[in-house]
């Protein structure tokens, strides 16, 4: 694989130096691999999950962080298909393919630290979510939060540059990169009065295969 060989050339140096893998992300976007699993009718390649996972493993052989990011991208990209309506999934797929979006997530199910409340226009979130893979270089995010009163969990798909979102560079567990420099694939994300309309919700129907 051409990209695997390119990533291998300086993986160790990049790991030591830290920083966001923006050049590598640009290569992924140019290759079309970010849209690999989006159905062809929505502008993607329509490939199988087994193909995407094979590619993620190949990347991980030479660069663990990039393999991590590439694999997690697809889970967030397909969240609307799993949890939303068919119409929501189609809309997300079309816009993601057209924009060549890279996806991150802030949906760590083990953390009860991000809460939402309803207002006239939708929801307002406050709190923090650790282990938010890919959020530091993402175009779009899958977000999950709990209701303070009911503990009910909600999901949404929103732009990563939404006002009120602050991406931290604080992951320090896997020893895969220098977290203080932003190279870690799993930083935390803070939300301060971050607003979401009800149209961005991607939950409320049974999970679909």
Residue ranges and their predicted role:
Residues 22-25, 29-30, 35-137:
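Glycine-rich flavin
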Residues 174-176, 181-209:
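Glycine-rich beta->alpha junctions and the first turn(s) of the following alpha-helix
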Residues 84-85, 120, 146-149, 160-162, ...:
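Short loop segments at secondary-structure junctions
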Residues 168-173:
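Glycine-rich, charged/polar anion/phosphate-binding loops
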Residues 128-164, 180:
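DPxDG-like acidic metal-binding loop motif
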Residues 3-11:
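N-terminal capping segment at the start of a domain
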